């Protein structure tokens, strides 16, 4: 299926509505808190220079970003426990230098009810404040938003992590290792300057063993490239 035809199936087609999702507003937003795990797989060589606030390995960047909410509460009545979000993104040059913007698309967990769907779009759209309000400033174009079955898995010992939307996105990685890596230990970076989930984090590095995208007008396949897993803990507004 072509990207053009596929866009006909997304929930929100009008680009102005997609962009409106990422316009900052925190009026009448309830208190919220979510925590869980995030990872990406990307086009860059290992380790991805973007995590160190540098330009991508090959000049441009293509990636899958996946979030799993272990614990989440939006307002007094809406639990977000166990829900997933998946993003696709591309850009050219250093995203942290302020001279480029991300072209993106987002999928939200189809098992979310109406209240949960609204909360997810508020939080991940940056309209509910918190870290994602800052992250949203990096986005220049939204190609589409949709709800889909998102499978997210991460090993307890961080030996592997993966996310999948059947027929659209596959992102699987294994923990980076080498001859000097002690058994069971992980290769980590403390306080990465280009962290995608906020300051003060710990990134665990991995190698993408499967990275394939054909959705929302994005199409690529990059195996054997960079990946990283980072826990997140956000509050708002």
Task: Give the residues covered by each predicted segment.
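Charged linear interaction tracts used for macromolecular binding and regulation
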Residues: 108-181
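Cationic, low-complexity basic patches in intrinsically disordered or flexible, solvent-exposed regions
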Residues: 7
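N-terminal ordered "arm"
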Residues: 27-74
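Extended, charged low-complexity segments
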Residues: 176-237
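Structured domain cores in non-transmembrane regions
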Residues: 69-137
């Amino acid at each position: 299926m072509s990207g053009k035809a596929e866009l006909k199936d997304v929930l929100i087609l009008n680009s102005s509505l997609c962009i409106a999702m990422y316009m900052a507003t925190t009026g009448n937003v309830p208190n919220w808190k979510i925590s869980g795990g995030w990872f990406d797989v990307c086009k860059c060589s290992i380790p991805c220079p973007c995590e160190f606030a540098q330009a991508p390995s090959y000049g441009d960047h293509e990636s899958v970003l996946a979030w799993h909410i272990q614990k989440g509460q939006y307002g007094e009545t809406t639990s977000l426990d166990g829900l997933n979000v998946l993003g696709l993104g591309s850009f050219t040059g250093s995203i942290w230098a302020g001279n480029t913007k991300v072209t993106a698309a987002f999928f939200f967990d189809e098992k979310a009810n109406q209240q949960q769907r609204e909360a997810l779009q508020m939080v991940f759209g940056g309209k509910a404040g918190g870290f994602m309000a800052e992250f949203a400033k990096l986005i220049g174009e939204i190609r589409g938003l949709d709800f889909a079955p998102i499978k997210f898995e991460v090993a307890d010992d961080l030996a592997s992590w993966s996310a999948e939307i059947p027929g659209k996105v596959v992102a699987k990685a294994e923990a980076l290792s080498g001859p000097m890596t002690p058994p069971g230990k992980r290769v980590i970076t403390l306080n990465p300057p280009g962290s995608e989930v906020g300051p003060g984090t710990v990134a665990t590095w991995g190698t993408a063993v499967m990275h394939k995208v054909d959705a929302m007008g994005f199409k690529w396949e990059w195996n054997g490239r960079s990946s990283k897993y980072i826990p997140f803990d956000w509050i708002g507004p």
